[in-house]
């Protein structure tokens, strides 16, 4: 396997939403599916990726994961608040994290030049 190329750091902030289903989620997921799909299709260019969460080997959905590019966390939340899955109180909890896309297919490689540059950023530099 080849080494990944070094690519520029993404300038737009990225936010990871990890949503845990509440007890009525299965019914609400079906009831609001059409509206949810319409919303994510309308905003598809804001998503790095998104989808349901399941335990390995299970077909039962127990939450959702969404990675969103937005100018700031308030703008990311504005996108989420337009989604019927968020407005119907389907989720028991929602965690939001500021995320740096550091390596992978989406960024097209890795964003660091050397181990020292990663250490410097990890220490707040």
Where are these predicted regions, by residue range?
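Conserved, structured core segments of small domains
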Residues: 2-125
């Amino acid at each position: 396997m080849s080494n990944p190329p070094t690519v520029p750091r993404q300038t737009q902030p990225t936010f990871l939403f990890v949503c845990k289903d509440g007890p009525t989620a299965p019914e609400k997921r079906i009831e609001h599916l059409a509206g949810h799909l319409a919303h994510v299709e309308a905003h598809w260019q804001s998503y790095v990726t998104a989808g349901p969460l399941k335990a390995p080997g299970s077909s039962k959905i127990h939450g959702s994961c969404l990675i969103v590019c937005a100018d700031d966390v308030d703008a990311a939340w504005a996108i989420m608040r337009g989604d019927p899955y968020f407005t119907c109180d389907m989720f028991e909890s929602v965690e939001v994290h500021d995320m740096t896309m550091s390596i992978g297919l989406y960024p097209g490689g890795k964003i660091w030049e050397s181990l020292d540059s990663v250490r410097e950023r990890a220490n707040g530099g």
